[in-house]
Amino acid sequence: MITSRAFAGRRYAVLGLARSGLATVEALVASGAGVTAWDDREEARDAAMALGADIGNPLDIDLIGFAGVVVSPGVPLNRHPIAAHARDAHVPVIGDIELFAEARSELPPHKVVGITGTNGKSTVTALIAHMLESAGVPVLMGGNIGLPILTREPLPEAGVYVLELSSFQIDLAHSLACDVAVLTNISPDHLDRYDGFEGYVASKARLFSLQHRDQVAIIATDDDPSKMIASRVNHRLHRVSAKDIDPVDQARWPALQGPHNAQNAVCAIAACRVLGLDDEAIERGLATFRSLPHRMELVGEARGARWYNDSKATNAASAAPALAAFPPAPDQRLHWIAGGQAKGDGLAACRPWFGHVKRAYLIGEAMAPFAAEIGDAIAIERSGDLASAVAQAAAAVQPGDIVLLSPACASFDQFKDYEARGEAFRAAVEALGA
């Protein structure tokens, strides 16, 4: 695990004891820190106590003298009382990424790449890690993807830590200076956590303000908020765009099809070039990359159609590129499963691609508003739930068709998370048989 002498003798409070919280407790205790931990679940408190933590709710104790309150990214700092309680005690509220940043000076010489953005950051993170690993570079992928960073063994000299960073994780980092910082795109998301869209944009921009002058920013300037952030960067900057990718080249990368993946690829290519990879190594990595689950993932063929799981598309801006990837053809019709717990401005971002859709199958809380929004442009089925949508699509498809689950919504009205929704889709498709 990653530990640091800098934590020894200090006292930390840890609020939230899911996977990353318990990993934080373990790393801090192993570093010689004192830890007071809390979670509403008794079994989580027992696990923290077994690791050597004291048990106590940070809201009920005097925090003066603590080095930090470590919270999970899921704690809404704009509403949770811990923010004011820590501020009154002049104690920073941080996350495990900040602890990693503070431990960096004791790690073997390395680089850190941080990737953020509304959409595409998981794919870009995995793609950068894959290209580096394919070139023989020691790599560790973490942050908002994979295992908690503090649980991992430090990389050897010349290794690269590739971190997916949500806006919440950036909010909780104060000294993270990424050698390479990447922004994929920005569109409205998580507005319940910020003071409007401007607050969300400012959170993303902080990743670049934390960098030093000799570090590199890579920003895809295909949207206005990203252009604005790029205009304010005063250190080394590479502006990139999905338009920089030649469709002939992209055709050689089977897991990176569609305009959104052109943007993902151009961001990853720029980062790997900064890190010293040559064009041959980059091309090899692009050609051998495999899609992440729930992101334009081909889950199988059934009833003569190809079925794609894009459950990670939890807003309209992330669903739009998936629709764009399947233009109509005489032997290819697109059946779109959409709906769930709606965010933001409905399906406005998808409207330019409505002409690609033969029929939409609407589910969840968004079924009625989506039907009202798109019923004048697309034939619809009010499916209600995912199982019904799959059954109705299976009855309607013809050989060569595409069925795309790209919900443009969160999943929490009917599923635990987008992964559970994607797995339910996969199971329903597999049950259809070939």
From Swiss-Prot:
Known catalytic reactions: UDP-N-acetyl-alpha-D-muramoyl-L-alanine + D-glutamate + ATP = UDP-N-acetyl-alpha-D-muramoyl-L-alanyl-D-glutamate + ADP + phosphate + H(+)
Domain of life: Bacteria
One cellular component (GO) term of this entry: cytoplasm
Alphabetized UniProt keyword annotations: ATP-binding, Cell cycle, Cell division, Cell shape, Cell wall biogenesis/degradation, Cytoplasm, Ligase, Nucleotide-binding, Peptidoglycan synthesis
Disulfide bridge positions per record: none
Function text: Cell wall formation. Catalyzes the addition of glutamate to the nucleotide precursor UDP-N-acetylmuramoyl-L-alanine (UMA).
Protein name as catalogued: UDP-N-acetylmuramoylalanine--D-glutamate ligase
